[in-house]
Amino acid sequence: MKKIIEVNNVSYHYDKEHALENIHFQVAKGSFTGLIGPNGSGKSTMLKLILGVLKKQQGSISLFGEKQADFKDWVKIGFVSQKSNAFNSAFPATVKEVVASGLTKKKGLFKTLNNKDKEDIDYALKRVEMTDYLHRNIGELSGGQQQRVFIARALVSRPELLILDEPTVGVDVENVKAFYELLAELNRTEEMTLLLVTHDLMAVNTYVNHVISINKRIIFDGSAHEYQHYLADRELEILAEQRRREDACLDCDASPV
């Protein structure tokens, strides 16, 4: 299976504190991978390293089989962040303008849209079912609708890999399920590789097929099915430890003074 992302023994620290230690994992072509972990686990740092925002201090990262340092074809990667709502009522922009801004990796800024660009915009909006909102101001849309537009912005360059960083932050509960179902459909119908950075266990349990759990180091790396068994085993271990502590307390209470 072709590897889209390969991370080998990557470590990173801020000052003297380790953010990541000897991280290693692979993301296969066509997979829907969930990168999970608690706050402060290093998820955001790992994402910044993959995207080249931070420079690794140890180990290696490859994208589409190339060393990250040599990788130039960033048009292959679409990105949706939890802060995509930078386009809002304070900076008015139409849905069309927001989606078109995703073409800058191909065209640069302030380039006139040609027919192919317009076809790509139409394709992206159709994929997220937002074609009727083409000329609406982005600030007028709900949180869920805005995130659909930002996915369209990431899709407009027709990437092979879509990376999403906590994409449902600020999205109402009613729209979260529809949002993840859209991602699953992209993965299924277009064989798009997805890397979802999240702490949403519902999404992990329901939609992804590959789970990577980190807490400054690799905690788990395997299929979603294997992860369910891992969680069940951990729960049993926690219950057993709780019982041992309760028994120890009972023994203490029963001891003569």
Curated annotation (Swiss-Prot):
Coiled coil: none annotated. Disulfide bonds: none annotated. Keywords: ATP-binding, Nucleotide-binding, Transport, Zinc. This is Zinc uptake system ATP-binding protein ZurA. GO terms for molecular function: ATP binding; ATP hydrolysis activity; ATPase-coupled transmembrane transporter activity. PROSITE patterns: ABC_TRANSPORTER_1 (PS00211), ABC_TRANSPORTER_2 (PS50893). SUPFAM superfamilies: P-loop containing nucleoside triphosphate hydrolases. Belongs to the ABC transporter superfamily. It comes from Listeria monocytogenes serovar 1/2a (strain ATCC BAA-679 / EGD-e). InterPro entries: AAA+_ATPase, ABC_transporter-like_ATP-bd, ABC_transporter-like_CS, Metal_Ion_Import_ABC, P-loop_NTPase. One of its GO terms (cellular component) is ATP-binding cassette (ABC) transporter complex.
